[in-house]
From Swiss-Prot:
The modification N6-acetyllysine is found at residues 6, 12-13, 16-17, 21, 24, 86. The modification PolyADP-ribosyl glutamic acid is found at residue 36. It is found in: Nucleus; Chromosome. Signal peptide: none annotated. CDD domains: HFD_H2B. PANTHER family: HISTONE H2B (PTHR23428). The modification N6-lactoyllysine is found at residues 6, 12, 16-17, 21, 24, 44, 86, 109, 117, 121. InterPro entries: Histone-fold (IPR009072), Histone_H2A/H2B/H3 (IPR007125), Histone_H2B (IPR000558), HISTONE_H2B_site (IPR055333). This is Histone H2B type 1-O. It comes from Homo sapiens. One of its GO terms (molecular function) is protein heterodimerization activity. The lineage of its organism: Eukaryota, Metazoa, Chordata, Craniata, Vertebrata. The gene is H2BC17.
Length: 126
């Protein structure tokens, strides 16, 4: 049995080698599927609010699930509203109404004001 003191040192935490594409038997490279998430955006917002605070991968997974869930709820409600009004397009008005219906009180007010600010910034940058 090899002596644990003489074995190769364990790699430092955070130092991961670049993952290369998997090789098939016929020599062709297989493309790895991309996993989309909101993690970079959650991280950017976290750093704006609390610059000295980090987030674990488990917490990031929970935040990603939360954002996906809220997105689906708002999109579904906005779709329903457009259908009720015999419209085929979801506009910012449907999104705003969906947010007002889904989110409680003060949270809805803040979400609507932030959304309006984002739409104004986007239209002025065009």
């Amino acid at each position: 049995m090899p002596d644990p003191a003489k074995s190769a040192p364990a790699p430092k935490k955070g130092s991961k080698k670049a993952v290369t594409k998997a090789q098939k038997k016929d020599g062709k490279k297989r493309k790895r599927s991309r996993k989309e998430s909101y993690s970079i955006y959650v991280y950017k917002v976290l750093k704006q609010v609390h610059p000295d605070t980090g987030i674990s991968s488990k917490a990031m997974g929970i935040m990603n699930s939360f954002v996906n869930d809220i997105f689906e709820r708002i999109a579904g409600e906005a779709s329903r509203l457009a259908h009720y009004n015999k419209r085929s397009t979801i506009t910012s008005r449907e999104i705003q109404t969906a947010v007002r219906l889904l989110l409680p009180g003060e949270l809805a007010k803040h979400a609507v004001s932030e959304g309006t600010k984002a739409v104004t910034k986007y239209t002025s940058s065009k």
